[in-house]
Regions:
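Subset of outer-membrane beta-barrel
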Residues: 19-354
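Sec-dependent signal peptide recognition
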Residues: 1-8
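Hydrophobic h-region of N-terminal signal peptides that target proteins for export
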Residues: 9-17
Length: 354
C-alpha cells in the first residue's frame, strides 16, 4: 500500500511538469469503421465486432466468430493526409477475446526547404529532401463477459503511441481505455473512459538539425516536452426493433463528457462539456443496411461576432454476406459543419475454425 501511494504521487508530480493539452493525440479521436461514421459515431452501447477495440473494448466480448478482422482507408484535406486502420480479434477458447489494432494518420512526401539556399546564397533545388510526419498507435485490447451478471461485459485497451516529424522530432506515449457494456433484451447501454489514467506522450526534439536556420530566422528553438491527454467519458444507449420479417431498426444515442476546459460543444462550461451524437440503422434481412447519424454539434462564431450552431449529418450503406461486410459512409452531407465531407470505406471479415 505504501509503495502504491509513492507511485501515485510520483505520477502526479510528473504530470504537473508536463503540459495538459485539449487536443493532444487528436488522431486517436478520428474514429474507425465506416458504419460507425455513418451513424454519427453513436456506437458505444451497441458495437459488437472487431471495431469495439477502438469504440468500446467491452463490445469485443460479444463477438461470436473465432476471428474478426477489419480494414479502413480514408483521405483528408484533398488527399494530403492519409488515414489507415487495421484490426484483428480472436477468441481465447472461453477465456475472453483478444484484439490488436493499428492506426496511422500521416502526411508523406513533405518537401524540406530548410537547406534550399546554399552557403553562397544560391537556390539549389537538389538540396530539397522529402520527409513524412505521422501519428501511429498500437492498441492491444482484451474483453470478456461477466460470470456473475448476465449481459454484462467489460474490457480494456492499452495504447502505445509513436509520433514523428521526419528526423526532426519524435514522441512516445502510452495510455489506457476502459469500457463496460450491458445488454438486456432489445436494449443495451455502454460506457468507455478514454485515457483513463491520462495518456502520456513525451516529445524529443532533434534541435541540432535546424538550430542554425531557426536562429537566422528569429524563431524560438523547440524544446523537449511532455503532453498529457485528460480522461474523457463517453456513455450511450441503444435499442433494436424487428419491424417485420424483413426489416429491423436500430437507434443509438451517445454523449461525450470532457473535463479539460470550455469547448465549443452543445453544452459547455469551465467544469465540463457534453457532446451528443445520434445514429440510426435500417436493416433489410440482415443483408443490406441504410444508416444516418448526426454529431459534431458545435457553437461557432461568425465574422460579425454572432454565435450559431453547426452540426455534421452523415449517411451510409452497408452489405453483409457470408461473413464479409462492406460499409460506406459520406460524412458532413451538405457541408453543414466546418469540417470537409469525406468518403469512407471499410471492409470486415469474420470466420470460424472448421
Amino acid at each position: 500500500m505504501k509503495s502504491s501511494l509513492i507511485a501515485f504521487f510520483l505520477i502526479l508530480t510528473s504530470a504537473a511538469s508536463g503540459q495538459v493539452r485539449k487536443y493532444a493525440n487528436s488522431f486517436l479521436n478520428i474514429g474507425v469503421d465506416a458504419r460507425a461514421f455513418a451513424m454519427g459515431q453513436a456506437v458505444v452501447a451497441q458495437v459488437s465486432d472487431v471495431s469495439a477495440a477502438y469504440w468500446n473494448p467491452a463490445g469485443l466480448a460479444r463477438i461470436t466468430s473465432d476471428w474478426d478482422a477489419a480494414l479502413m482507408h480514408a483521405e483528408y484535406f484533398a488527399s494530403i493526409a492519409q488515414y489507415d486502420y487495421a484490426s484483428v480479434a480472436t477468441q481465447l477458447e472461453g477465456k475472453g477475446v483478444l484484439a490488436v489494432t493499428f492506426l496511422r494518420f500521416g502526411v508523406d512526401d513533405i518537401p524540406n526547404t530548410s537547406e534550399l539556399i546554399d552557403e553562397n546564397g544560391n537556390v539549389d533545388y537538389n538540396r530539397i529532401q522529402l520527409f513524412s510526419a505521422a501519428d501511429q498507435a498500437l492498441l492491444i485490447s482484451y474483453a470478456r463477459s461477466s460470470a456473475s451478471v448476465e449481459g454484462l461485459s467489460y474490457g480494456g485497451s492499452a495504447k502505445l503511441v509513436y509520433r514523428y516529424i521526419g528526423d526532426f522530432a519524435d514522441a512516445y506515449g502510452f495510455g489506457f481505455d476502459l469500457g463496460l457494456q450491458y445488454q438486456r433484451g432489445r436494449w443495451a447501454v455502454g460506457a468507455i473512459m478514454r485515457d483513463a489514467t491520462s495518456t502520456f506522450t513525451a516529445w524529443s526534439v532533434e534541435s541540432g538539425a535546424f538550430d542554425e536556420v531557426f536562429l537566422q530566422t528569429g524563431n524560438e528553438l523547440p524544446q523537449n516536452n511532455v503532453e498529457w491527454s485528460l480522461p474523457r467519458l463517453i456513455m450511450g444507449g441503444s435499442g433494436i426493433w424487428e419491424l417485420d420479417e424483413r426489416y429491423s431498426l436500430r437507434t443509438s444515442l451517445d454523449a461525450e463528457f470532457t473535463f479539460d476546459g470550455r469547448r465549443n460543444t452543445l453544452v459547455s462550461s469551465d467544469f465540463g462539456n457534453v457532446d451528443p451524437r445520434f445514429g440510426a440503422e435500417l436493416g433489410y434481412k440482415g443483408f443490406a443496411f441504410f444508416r444516418m447519424g448526426v454529431g459534431n454539434i458545435n457553437r461557432t462564431l461568425d465574422l460579425n461576432g454572432d454565435r450559431s450552431y453547426s452540426w455534421q449529418p452523415n449517411l451510409g450503406i452497408g452489405f453483409r454476406y457470408q461473413g464479409i461486410q462492406l460499409d460506406y459512409a459520406l460524412t458532413d452531407i451538405g457541408d453543414r459543419s466546418a469540417a470537409l465531407y469525406s468518403n469512407l470505406f471499410s471492409l470486415r471479415y469474420n470466420w470460424s475454425r472448421q
